[in-house]
Design a protein with these regions (language model features):
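An N-terminal hydrophobic leader/cap segment in hydrolases
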Residues: 7-72
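The serine-hydrolase catalytic nucleophile loop
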Residues: 101-115
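Conserved alpha/beta-hydrolase
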Residues: 116-136
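Alpha/beta-hydrolase active-site loop
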Residues: 140-161
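Hydrolase active-site cap/lid region
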Residues: 181-236, 245
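Short alpha-helix in the alpha/beta-hydrolase fold that links the catalytic acid
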Residues: 243, 252, 266-275
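Short beta-strand/loop motif that positions the catalytic acidic residue
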Residues: 249-251, 256-258, 262
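Catalytic histidine-centered segment of alpha/beta-hydrolase-like enzymes
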Residues: 290-304
């Protein structure tokens, strides 16, 4: 009996530790927070300071643009916000730029905005993802709930630009997962192509990688407990967030970009997403030396060359 009681006590202790640990990771990952992610986990303090200085430059550039605040209602009743920046000359081409986890349009796309607007002559739509910026929402959607929001913004842009609109999607990190999941749904014919930069194959695989790589923890039972909390509070399951599964259903043109020095979403996920993609019109590009979400700043010339060719052939 004494041994049995000790076993029960040990089991209770393990269960309690699992619940506490799972709650810690849930609070770390799922609820809304205001702090931005600074890309490049291995960056020095000097590099991070330089990135913050660049952000100040992006904000000055944005302040000089004739940007308009747009609002839309999500499928579940949230008020969504986006900035719309028209091209200098009238055009029916628009790029919808979908930012990543705990980030913002300026943080992820600030350096690209002049390229898209001034060189590619495109209108720009910069949505704040649900749970970020001026959009409502108390939880991170990891691409699942968010992809419905992207479809809402697609409809808003077609309504604004008319039936001749050419709509492109470009997502970074979690935003890349979002646009891949979006591509698996039936979309209006005005959607011409999708660019995904450092997107994960599935949320389960990404969280499994992070728990092993950064925390050196077994995936279970933690992941199952966090998943239950997420379903209860945020309304989705981790298995819903599956870009690779969505790619098996798409016929849209795809440009897939990844850095070969990405230690957050490892570059092997580029190959898995590419292989999963059912589109006959797809291309993958590996940027040498690029950390997570830093492919553009690492090799701007190659990035712009690939994007220019992709859009130019399909707009």
């Amino acid at each position: 009996m004494h041994a049995f009681q000790k076993a029960l006590a040990a089991a209770a202790g393990l269960a309690g530790a699992t619940m506490l640990g799972s709650r810690y990771f849930y609070e770390l990952a799922i609820p809304r927070r205001s702090k931005l992610t600074i890309h490049g986990r291995g960056q020095s303090p000097e590099q991070k300071a330089a990135q913050r200085k660049r952000m100040e430059g992006f904000e000055r550039w944005m302040a000089e643009q004739p940007a308009e605040d747009l609002w839309a209602a999500s499928f579940d009743g949230l008020r969504l916000h986006a900035k719309y920046i028209p091209a200098d000359e009238p055009t029916d081409r628009v790029m919808i730029l979908v930012h990543g986890y705990r980030s913002s349009p300026l943080n992820d796309f600030g350096e690209m905005l002049p390229f898209y607007r001034d060189r590619m002559k495109m209108n720009l739509l910069l949505p704040d993802d649900r749970g970020h910026g001026q959009s409502e929402g108390g939880y991170i959607g990891f691409g699942w709930q968010d992809h419905f929001d992207v479809e809402t913004w697609i409809d808003v842009m077609i309504g604004r630009l008319g039936p001749s609109a050419s709509v492109f999607l470009h997502g970074v990190s979690m935003g890349a997962a979002t646009v891949m999941i979006t591509a698996g749904d039936p979309l209006p014919k005005q959607v011409r192509g999708v660019i995904e930069d450092c997107g994960y194959t599935s949320l389960v695989e990404e969280l499994t990688y992070c728990m092993h790589h950064y925390y050196h923890l077994p995936v279970q039972p933690f992941l199952a407990e966090i998943d239950l909390c997420t379903k209860r509070d945020a309304g989705y399951r981790f298995e819903d967030c599956d870009p690779a599964a969505a790619l098996r259903k798409t016929s849209l043109p795809f440009l897939m970009i990844h850095g070969d020095d990405d230690h957050f979403v490892p570059s092997f996920m580029l190959d898995r997403n590419y292989d999963a993609c059912a589109s006959a019109d797809k291309r993958k590009v590996l940027i040498h030396g690029a950390d997570h979400a830093l492919a553009y700043v690492t090799d701007r010339a190659l990035y712009e060359q690939e994007v220019s060719a992709f859009i130019g052939a399909r707009a």
